[in-house]
Swiss-Prot record:
Listed transmembrane segments: none
Entry protein name: Adenosine 5'-phosphosulfate reductase
Annotated binding of [4Fe-4S] cluster, by residue: C120, C121, C203, C206
Organism, as annotated: Bacillus pumilus (strain SAFR-032)
GO cellular component, one term: cytoplasm
Amino acid sequence: MLTYENWQEPSITFQEDDLYKGALSVLKWAYGHYGDQLVYACSFGIEGIVLIDLIAKVKKDARIVFLDTGLHFKETYDTIDAVKERYPGLDIVLKTPELTVEEQNDQHGDQLWKTDPQSCCHMRKVIPLQEALSGYPAWLSGLRREQSPKRAGTNFLNKDEKFKSVKVCPLIHWTWKDIWRYASREELTYNPLHDQGYPSIGCAPCTQPAFTAQDLRSGRWSGTAKTECGLHE
């Protein structure tokens, strides 16, 4: 089994010129290789909705983890409920941080996401994901190369130094248009905030509509130098 500890550049070749741009063949390999030891950390944005639909074609009881910071939009929780209804076999887990938002306010000051967004993301996202991935040799992510310069070098299989794991990214070759074509063709239910100018959706206090169509993540942590929550750095 390919793990972080025995990592070597994989010699596996995935078919990249098919209808799914390699995504389905990557998922078939990943679940064939890792089985129940593969977990998908999903934000339930449109990429996540597409990837869940692809996952369900391969493993109907796959484990899906959502990092429930307690600060998400109501529309995000409604989307999760819709996904649960459409794919009842999936094992969808909402992972919460150690501290509630109120406890965090008491211990670290009100609205830490404004005063120290890096620490807020670390406590409410990074640490919970570390806990959720504990014991799993690999995890799935919906990263696409097109999303940002930092993500442009992502491969199908990646040695993840952050979480000491193997990160599997089936959608790296998909464009924004590919994502929406698939969602439309398969009639997928998605977060309605996408139709209100939010291409990238995270916690409500730190997410605004995108300022430019060229940078789909420009609405995240607006007014700060922060561009990632820390999960993919």
